[in-house]
Structure formats: structure tokens, C-alpha cells
């Protein structure tokens, strides 16, 4: 309960900035509720006057006649009430929508700001889809709860309060009957909701399973056809849909009992009101108009009770979403940045001095590692999958800080440099080339927003991608789609090389050309990378040892440890792990 209160109280800190709109919305909603509640009473006055006139006429009284001026006043009040009700409802929603949308905007902006300041380790621990869900569906759930549930709660609470006040004002005995029906109606509705909720949750889970199954089968449709798995796939899908049908039936059957039960309680209340109310009308203690007002109030009382019951589930969902949002916001930021900035460009001299590192406490990954890299040198990092090649890059880029020792660039401890200034000195080209939705020109200019069109073309030529770009519809102005699927993987990598050239970094992080490209494109990528590495300190993640024989230094990693380092010739002469790797690749190549 404490966590729930904390989540909603933190939400109020966002809404508080727009408390004027929120207060106006609540005031106008209460106004519309009042106008709705007085409707039966106003109509009752008119009905009382009409029935009184009819009874006088039936008795043959000489003074019998319709008091038209009184009826006109009542009808005017009724129309005025209707106008106030509509205006109150409209502007209540208007002000609340305005406040909610601003609140959601602030929340998303804070999430975006937080994402830019949390350490990279957070992304290693959480799936991308989970984080995306917090940005989109969780924030949207909170938005819907604020915009719909909040005003519905206000409407339900004040409707109940005003209806109770009116029925007690009109007749205490009948009012107590109406009040007695409220807890019976509420707990009946809550009982049904509680019984049906697990089935609705199971229905949502099974629906998610079905969606995942369909997506998986559509994605791998060719493989499905190749291995003649259509029948088994259809049988599995049938099992899922059968489960969905059974659960859906139970959920809707139980929840479908709500209205008949609530209507039954209402009918019983109507019966009691009609019986005792009719007796009081005959006794002259209750007018016909007030009697019909009672009947309408019984009807008005059901809807807010049902809404409050259903809103409990919506608020629980909103609370869960708020918890997930604030979990991100409560993540610790990166270690506070320093104000020391680089006085000029780096030359690219890199030193690892007695470096220790561990992702998890008491589980060291790198111990007492030392390395000196001169400006312009090429350092290759090799090793089997999972050896820790990415760890060195993470340390160099300062995505993680060393546990002990230091990494210096041009004599500066990188922990004492502004991250922004430091990372601007780097260029990165990986196999998983990242391009965003936009034109090719915008993608190339990503690392240097001030680059001219001429500089963009020169960088593309140096990356051997200019000719390819000009063959595309629109050339440099061609729009990339969201997944960049309208160009191949190798072409993406050439574009990222051109982007790195345009940014003119002093230190490079490179991945070899993806093995899925054809030989001609692979040669173009290798040539473009050589152009990119000229005069720059380069760290190359190597997969095929035949491509790094010219490296000035080769680091050999195994099980997270740097077990060998040297150049190609010296490592072969040592006949260690590198020698075994090289010979195994060479043997496999010959066998092919």
C-alpha cells in the first residue's frame, strides 16, 4: 500500500504544475454532476403541478386550471440546467485533457532525460522491448487513467453524495431504502469483478502467446514450408485458440452476470420504492413528482457504483505502470561528470595501466592489464565468442569505469574528462550498422551537423559508397525506412564508414565486414576501412585472422582474460593460443 501511495503521490508532483487546470476540471465536473442530479427533482416539480391540476379538474373544482407561468419557469430552469450540464461536462474534459497531455509530455521528457544519463550497464540488464514498453504503453496507461478514471471517480463520488442528499431531503424513509441498496450493489459488483479478473488476465496472456506464435510463423514462413511443418503448426495454433476460447468464455460469462444482478437489485429497490412510495402518495405525505424523482435516483445510483468497481482494476493497472516508469527514473545516474574539457584535438595515444575490471563484485574479468598504443597504430582484438572483446571497447569508450588502474588518452585519465568532449573524439563502425529513419544525407551528417554537401560527397567517395548512392532513387535524398531494410547490410556498413569519415574522429572502434556480404562488397568495405584508419588510432574487433596481419598490436582474449599480445609474426612464433586459432581458420579455409 505504501508503494501504491508513493507512486500516486509522485504522479501528483507532475500534475501539481497544472493544478489550475485540474481544479477547474474538478469544479466543472461537480457542476455537471449537480445539474444531472437536480434533473429528476425539477421534472418532479413539473409533474406534481400537472397531476395536481388534473386531480382538481377531476374533482370539478372551479379554480382548476394549469399554472402556465409556473410550468414555464420550471421548463426554463430545466433548459438552463441542461446548458450548464453540457458546458460543465465539455470544459471539464477540456481542462483535464490539457493537464494530462502536458503531464504525459513532462513524464516522457523526464524518461528521455533519464535514459541519456543512466549507465550502459542498465541496458545490459534490461531488454529493449521492456524499456520501449515503459516509454509507450505504460505512459499511455497512466494517461488514460488520468484522463478517464480521474474524472469518473469524481463523477461517481459526487453523484452518490448528491443523490443520497436528495433522497433524504425528499423522504427519509424511502431515502434509507435507497442508501441500503448502495453497499449491496457495490459489493455484488466487486465480487463479480474479482471472480472474473483472473480469467481476463489469463485471456490477455493467451492472446499474447497467440500473437507471438503468429509473428514467429509469419517470420519463418519459408522454413515452415521447407520442413513441411504446416500441419503441426496448425494443430498448435488450434490448441492456443481453443484455450483462448475457453478462457474468454469464462471471463465474459462471469462478468456478464454483473448487469443482470445489478438490474435485479435495482428492480427490487424499485419495487420497494413503488410499494411504500405509493402508500405515502395516497397518504398525502409524498407528491407524485417526488415519487418519480425517487425512481430516477435509484437508476442514477447504479452507474457510479458500477464505475467505481471497474475503476479499481484500471487504477491497479495504472499503479503497475507508474511503478515501472518510476523504476527507470530511480535508477542511479552515471558517475557525475567532470568539468575538465579538452583544450584541443587528441593525437590518439592510449595507455592501459594496471587495469582491473569486473562486471559483478568478486568476479574479476580483467586483471592487471597494461597496453601502450601510439598515435595512428592499429590494435586488433581477437578471441572466441564471449571472450570479452566488447569489454575492452566498453572500458575505452567509458561506458564502464575501470575497477582499478587507469586508462589515459594523451596523458589524460579518461575519468577526469568530460564524457561529451571525450566521446566526440571517437568513431565507431560495427557489423550491426545503425541508421535511423531519414535521408541518406541526414544519416551521413549525423556525426557532423555542420558538414557541407561537398564534404558529404567526398566522404562517400572515400568510403566507396558514392556510386551506389547515386544509383538509388533520390540519391543522397532517398528516405531510409525505419529498419533501413531498403538497403543491404554491407551497404549500411559502407554508409557508416562514410559517416565516421565525415565526423573525422581521432580514435576508431571498428568491426570487420559482416560475413553475409558478397566478396566484391567485402573488398569495398575493407578498402573503405583502410581509408578510414589512415592517420588514426584504431581498435579492430577481428573475426578472421587473415585480415589483421598488418596490425601493430594484437590482443588475444580467452575467458575474459588477455592471454597474449604482440604482432602477427611474434604471436605465431610463440605458438600459443593465437597460433592455434590461426591454424584452425587456415585449415578450415583449405578444407572449404
Walk through the language-model features, giving the residues of each:
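Alpha-helical segments in transporter systems
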Residues: 20-45, 74, 78, 93-97, ...
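Cytosolic ends of transmembrane helices, especially the final helix of ABC transmembrane type-1 domains
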Residues: 206, 229, 253, 270, ...
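Transmembrane helices of ABC transporter permease
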Residues: 21-34, 148-202, 273-286, 303
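An intracellular "coupling" helix at the cytosolic face of ABC transporter transmembrane type-1 domains
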Residues: 14-20, 120-121, 139-146, 150, ...
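Juxtamembrane loop-to-helix connectors within ABC transporter transmembrane domains
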Residues: 15, 96-100, 116-160
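ABC-type nucleotide-binding domain
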Residues: 337, 343-592
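Transmembrane helix-loop-helix hairpins at lipid-water interfaces of multipass membrane proteins
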Residues: 23-88, 169-173, 284-288
Amino acid at each position: 500500500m505504501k508503494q501504491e501511495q508513493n507512486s500516486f503521490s509522485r504522479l501528483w508532483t507532475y500534475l501539481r504544475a497544472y493544478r489550475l487546470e485540474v481544479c477547474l476540471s474538478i469544479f466543472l465536473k461537480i457542476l455537471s454532476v449537480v445539474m444531472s442530479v437536480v434533473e429528476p427533482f425539477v421534472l418532479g416539480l413539473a409533474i406534481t403541478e400537472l397531476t395536481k391540476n388534473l386531480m382538481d379538474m377531476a374533482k370539478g373544482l372551479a379554480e382548476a386550471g394549469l399554472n402556465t407561468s409556473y410550468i414555464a419557469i420550471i421548463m426554463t430552469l430545466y433548459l438552463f440546467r441542461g446548458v450548464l450540464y453540457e458546458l460543465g461536462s465539455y470544459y471539464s474534459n477540456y481542462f483535464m485533457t490539457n493537464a494530462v497531455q502536458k503531464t504525459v509530455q513532462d513524464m516522457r521528457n523526464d524518461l528521455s532525460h533519464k535514459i541519456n544519463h543512466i549507465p550502459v550497464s542498465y541496458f545490459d540488464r534490461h531488454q529493449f522491448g521492456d524499456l520501449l514498453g515503459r516509454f509507450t504503453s505504460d505512459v499511455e496507461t497512466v494517461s488514460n487513467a488520468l484522463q478517464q478514471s480521474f474524472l469518473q471517480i469524481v463523477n461517481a463520488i459526487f453523484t452518490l453524495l448528491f443523490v443520497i442528499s436528495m433522497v433524504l431531503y425528499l423522504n427519509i424513509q424511502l431515502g434509507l431504502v435507497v442508501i441500503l441498496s448502495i453497499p449491496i450493489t457495490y459489493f455484488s459488483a466487486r465480487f463479480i469483478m474479482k471472480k472474473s479478473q483472473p480469467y481476463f488476465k489469463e485471456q490477455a496472456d493467451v492472446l499474447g502467446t497467440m500473437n507471438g506464435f503468429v509473428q514467429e510463423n509469419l517470420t519463418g514462413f519459408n522454413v515452415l514450408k521447407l520442413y513441411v511443418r504446416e500441419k503441426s503448426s496448425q494443430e498448435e495454433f488450434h490448441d492456443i485458440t481453443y484455450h483462448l476460447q475457453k478462457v474468454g468464455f469464462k471471463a465474459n460469462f462471469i462478468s456478464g452476470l454483473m448487469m443482470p444482478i445489478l438490474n435485479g437489485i435495482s428492480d427490487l429497490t424499485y419495487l420497494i420504492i413503488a410499494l411504500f412510495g405509493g402508500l405515502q402518495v395516497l397518504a398525502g405525505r409524498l407528491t407524485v413528482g417526488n415519487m418519480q424523482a425517487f425512481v430516477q435516483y435509484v437508476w442514477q445510483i447504479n452507474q457510479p457504483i458500477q464505475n467505481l468497481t471497474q475503476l479499481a482494476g484500471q487504477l491497479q493497472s495504472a499503479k503497475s505502470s507508474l511503478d515501472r516508469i518510476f523504476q527507470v527514473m530511480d535508477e542511479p545516474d552515471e558517475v557525475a561528470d567532470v568539468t575538465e574539457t579538452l583544450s584541443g584535438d587528441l593525437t590518439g595515444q592510449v595507455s592501459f595501466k594496471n587495469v582491473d575490471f569486473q562486471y559483478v563484485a568478486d568476479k574479476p574479468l580483467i586483471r592487471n592489464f597494461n597496453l601502450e598504443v601510439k598515435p595512428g597504430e592499429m590494435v586488433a582484438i581477437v578471441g572466441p565468442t564471449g571472450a570479452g572483446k566488447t569489454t575492452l571497447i566498453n572500458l575505452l569508450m567509458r561506458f564502464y569505469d575501470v575497477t582499478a588502474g587507469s586508462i589515459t588518452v594523451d596523458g589524460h585519465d579518461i575519468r577526469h574528462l568530460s564524457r561529451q568532449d571525450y566521446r566526440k573524439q571517437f568513431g565507431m563502425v560495427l557489423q550491426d550498422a545503425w541508421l535511423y529513419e531519414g535521408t541518406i544525407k541526414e544519416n551521413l551528417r549525423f556525426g557532423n551537423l555542420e558538414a557541407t554537401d561537398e564534404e558529404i560527397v567526398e566522404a562517400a567517395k572515400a568510403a566507396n559508397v558514392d556510386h551506389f548512392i547515386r544509383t538509388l532513387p533520390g540519391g543522397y535524398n532517398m528516405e531510409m525506412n525505419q529498419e533501413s531494410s531498403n538497403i543491404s547490410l554491407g551497404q549500411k556498413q559502407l554508409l557508416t564508414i562514410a559517416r565516421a569519415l565525415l565526423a573525422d574522429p581521432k580514435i576508431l572502434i571498428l568491426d570487420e565486414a559482416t560475413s553475409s556480404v558478397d566478396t566484391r562488397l567485402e573488398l569495398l568495405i575493407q578498402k573503405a576501412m583502410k581509408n578510414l584508419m589512415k592517420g588514426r588510432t584504431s581498435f579492430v574487433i577481428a573475426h578472421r585472422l587473415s585480415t589483421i596481419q598488418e596490425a601493430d598490436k594484437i590482443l588475444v582474449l580467452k575467458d575474459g582474460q588477455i592471454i597474449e599480445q604482440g604482432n602477427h609474426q611474434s604471436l605465431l612464433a610463440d605458438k600459443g593460443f593465437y597460433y592455434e586459432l590461426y591454424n584452425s581458420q587456415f585449415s578450415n579455409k583449405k578444407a572449404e
